[in-house]
Amino acid sequence: MQKLFCRGKAWYTERDNSEVVEENQMDIWKRMYEKAKEQYHPEEVSPFIYAHHVVCAIEAENGDIYTGFCIESCSGVMNICADRLAALNMYANSGQTKIKRFIAFRDSAPNGGGSGMPCGACQEFFYQLNEANEDMEIMVDYEKRETITLKELMPNWWGKERYAEAKSN
């Protein structure tokens, strides 16, 4: 996990004490949180569908922010997580597949303990969408600005061989 700490106005990572993170870069997490929070308004869409009770924001490679919300139905196969909906919004609206940063939550920001982690299906989807997503930062604790990468969550992902084969062909 990556922890950030501040010295004066500069931010540093715990992994590499010499790496400076620009102060305006720190604002991206607040912007993402606020954009996702706009989507949070749990509602019963119909007697069969419940939505907007989990929300997500992702930052695409070009810096644009895309959001998503969870949709659950009484038929589980039609459920879609906020995470995948945000990624699909990114792809549908820009054609991008690489995700730089990710935050997901219910009624409050992630506070450690796995409260904002993508589920296994979403982790798999992110890997399949773009191999480079293994380096996406996933918010673990919003107040501490603690993150983890997809690669750290799934260090032995099965699809790396297929990506390697595709590159060699």
PLM segments and residue spans:
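Short beta-strand scaffold segments in enzyme catalytic cores
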Residues: 51-60
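Short, positively charged and aromatic/hydrophobic N-terminal segments
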Residues: 9-13, 17
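C-terminal binding/interaction regions
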Residues: 25-45, 98-169
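Active-site- and interface-proximal helix/loop "cap" or "latch" segments in soluble metabolic
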Residues: 79-83, 89-98
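Compact, glycine-rich, soluble single-domain proteins
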Residues: 70-84
